[in-house]
């Protein structure tokens, strides 16, 4: 039953109960105990607290007595009470000794009581410990030590006693920290051999106790120690237990040992010698274990200052136990290694021990010797067999050293219950050494990181401050490095290690290397990196072992996974270059090829690679160039092992020549990928200087790799074909030349933002771009695929950089960063292109495919630019100039088509076609880029860039590869115009007079380019200069050979003008720079022939432009010049042989004339040029075009004629009409109207052709109120046109008829309709003329008019107008002649001396004669009425008194003769013809007929044949009579012979015939004839005989008439046959008688 210690009341009740039980139990056995118990009960009843209880010494007496009784039951009851009293101070100090004696007595009883004592004693000491010292302390310890000596003791008692004893000893030592001591007594104790100090009772107890324990070995060997010196009876304590107690003291009382000099002294002179003896001389495993455990507790940093020499001896002893030379047992070596293993886990103690021992040459080195001995041990035959090292990293099939067989369940130092050592396993010893090595590496790494953090190292490196680190860690590391390095190397080359153990070694070695880096120990880091590279890359045991893997390995591993180019692979794309060269080389050198290095690699090497990469990740910021060299070259070789040679290398080898891939699991490859990804990610934290170093190393390695081929031209050299050289230095891999280019690219893509770090970032970018560009433009590279791969990597860098910055979420920061990046990126693209452009291009470059490759390079660069613009164009700000230079790069590709055509050696047309197609593709991509800019970013461009936009457009327009691009580019000019329009600000860009003069002066001085490119130009200068530059270049595009492009360019030009002219600079500048070159361009015949549409559009635009912007002739001094050049331009174009062109020009000329009319103050020179264009037109009669869409000369002339009205209007507006102008116009009209061929399917019989009508309309425009001279010219032209249907038609028919095909004969013009209409117009115009003054100069024109009319009248043409009731043309002409004659006669009456008179009178007489002439019966019948009418009109005019006087006798005689000739109704018979031929004059004829002998010559019974036009004849008969009655004497005189002869002939025929016909009736016409003549003669005679007659000089003609008297008399006999005849004859006979 356990005593409850809850409180005094509870304790009181329990004690009372226990005391009563004790009293009851002792009642019969021991009265003393009973009385004592009762007394204690009484005491208990009186006290109320523990303090009161403590004042009663007798209270504890029953318990002491009960224990002394050795009665088990009473002792048990007493122990129960003592247990309770032990928990609280309740026993008087005076009773403590008795109580302890009671405990000692109780230890002799049963086991339960013994255990109870052991349970109570620690509690008792805890409560009353301050009073227990000296003898009491000895008694206290005796309570436990007694139980250790009991024979046949139960293990539980011994174990509990042992534990309790250790607890009490620990508490005795812990008591040293109590400052208050109940006893002031002091004791002397030694602190050295000659010194002592005084200590209190507690410390004295501890001193004696520690001395007793450390004297175990002395007691056992020298016998008992005096009682006074013994605090603990250890005479019979086993050495092992004593060492256990010592271990406990060393473990739990370290503080006291370190603070108390007396204890330290005992430690040096007692404890350590004891341990050394036990460990060196003991053959007992357990004793050695306990000793080692104690030593382990002493080998601490805290003890070094007090046990320096002792520990040196201890450690040396332990190390000696490890060595091969030691004669100690194996388990002792194990114990030493285990101890050092534990020590190695504590970096602090390692560093401390090193600095205290290894750091001094005069001291025993600890860890150096340890590592040395371990190395020697491992290299011993016994151990080296187990390691089974190899020259390459590999693993045996069944590893000898595994986790299972190299470990023990319990460490030897923990085998406390083993008296004999277990069997020794060599693998365990190896494992211990390996672990020590690992721990030391890890400890050094930890210490290095703590003493010199990596961050600080990086900062120091950035500041380029050498650390100058002479710290403890550096010394320790430097001292241990060689040993650790050799151990790690030994383990790494071991083939017997299990994989997991190998990984531990790798990790340890990695930490060793990492520590070197952290501590800036470059040589040691390089050594580690070198070993790493050798371990990883060396996969053959000797240089002769360069054969393929065995059959089992030759098959392609199904588990090997292809890896993306973003991680390890660096295989560039296959070359697009003509492979003929490489294939030829391959065939030629097949026998000379070197055998490729095997590609086998183990998983262990993969592990090492991962460690190397991990090391690069952690130490990258402080790596030097050499460390990076080992890293990258190792990486390069591994890439070859896993993925084989790069594509460029494969081109020179057959696939069967390439070694098979290694057998790796998918996880192996994945782990490599993962590690490399982490490596790339880690570089993002690199500083710019570190990153610069990495890139520099990569570039250097890349250069070295690319030069390997040249180094190995001698087949005896094989540098780069194997990873290690003769000195075991790793060298670049020739199988993977593009590796470093790939790594540069990947590193750059992971560190894009570093390029934004100001000057450092620019240097980084420059480093990369300069090298990349150098490679891209290097034609000396062995394989062009490397160039293509490089450009792909470079563009990937660019795209990644722009993507990373451009996709940033921080808008403000993004804009700023992209502004920095864009210059780097775009400048690099431009520099790349420039490097390509600078290369010469010759026949060889074309033929060997170099140009093909470089075209692919340019294409890739353009695609990159396109992607950048497509994604982030809106962020671009400063690099637009270079962007446009890049866009223009395809146009500077100097490979021309002629380079191929002139090369006869190049037979492969596919080569040419391929290059041309690539050029097309480049241009297409370039245009796509530009289109992207123009669609999305044009409005955001600065004005300083617009020049480049325009230049780019010109290049796109001018290129000949893609017509669609040329078309589309032309329309882009419109967008540039919109751009400029949007930026127009009237307030800032409008030009003052001063600004205008300044701008004009610069442009006149050919400084336009300077204006738009100079940063010093004002905004208004730049703006206006860009407009001029835009328009000028757009016009320059019209010089393109392709008609479609020319048309599009000029159309866009004028559309821009229409839409944006309000924003334009001064028009005089535009004219000077833009329009004038267009107007002064020299046109070839071919151009004029083929570019009609262009010319037409150009003229349309110009004609629209000029009236709007060049109309101020009054204020603009250059306006006249500008118009003059335009008109000269038109005139030059009209010299074209192309009818289409001329037609277009003429149409635009018409429009221009209409526009000029609206302009005021047009100068005379301009008017003159306008006229000259019209009048100087050269009409050529050429037609016969078979193309319906083509224009003919006829069309041109027609359009020209239709344009005359506005010209006339213009001339009239300024009163500039001159005779010269009119004559030239009419000359043109005259030439035009005689055009010898009509258009297809056109007839001009009933209505005039279009041109004929146009000419007539043109003539109609001339007003009758124009000058008289002009009017005469118009009349002349109309008259000339009127006769076209006659002579001109005949000439055309005669000339062209034989030459034309029959189908075209109907195209010959008849001119009938136009002649008629012209004649009609002539009559109308004549009718409008009131007076007709005839100048001498115009007389010939008038005569010509009359002659033309006379010609028409003469021909008696029956041509009529379109209306059926219209009169024939000859009558119309006669009317004109008649009207005109009337007006002329009026003029001549006033100017009788006019030279026109005689000619006109001749013409007039001729016209009258024509009306009386007989042509042919058919025509005469048709014209008789008109002839009679026309004759009558003329006769009336002629017989007017003042008019007839204008005619001379010859003219009148001609007229009278015509009348006489027309007066015959019948044809002459032979007799009459003979008579007339015999007679020279009509008077003679009359005389002869008067004396005619009717008896000899008879008439005829048949009537003679009638003549046509009898009505005219009758009229003429009457006129002959009337003429004799006319008052004009000259007329009568001239008429008399004719009338006399006429009557004589009539009478002769009548007389002759009537004698024959007898009673036959006389024909009516004969009757009429005779009646008319004889009646007229009667009238004449009456007038002559009448005194009152108005006739003057009545005798005129009487003589001639008197010759008729005989015939009159002869008629009388036959006069009765005709009614009235007889009377007339008789009257005449009487009259003649009167005359006589």
Curated annotation (Swiss-Prot):
Residue ranges with Polar residues bias: 547-563, 577-589
Principal location: Golgi
Location relative to the cell: Golgi apparatus membrane
GO cellular component: a single term: Golgi membrane
Stretch list, region Disordered: 547-596
Coiled-coil boundaries: none
Keywords from the UniProt entry: Acetylation, Golgi apparatus, Membrane, Phosphoprotein, Protein transport, Transport
Positions of modified residues (Phosphoserine): 564, 567, 571
Membrane topology field: Peripheral membrane protein
Ranges for region Required for function in membrane trafficking: 1501-1636
Pfam family, one: Mon2_C
The keyword Protease appears for this protein: no
Residues found modified as N-acetylalanine: 2
GO BP: any one term: trans-Golgi network membrane organization
Positions of the UniProt region annotated as Golgi membrane targeting and interaction with ARL1: 60-410
Protein family: Belongs to the MON2 family.
Misc. comment: Present with 2410 molecules/cell in log phase SD medium.
Function (record text): Required for traffic between late Golgi and early endosomes. Required for endocytosis and maintenance of vacuolar structure.
Subunit structure: Homodimer. Interacts with DOP1. Interacts with ARL1. Interacts with NEO1.
Protein name: Protein MON2
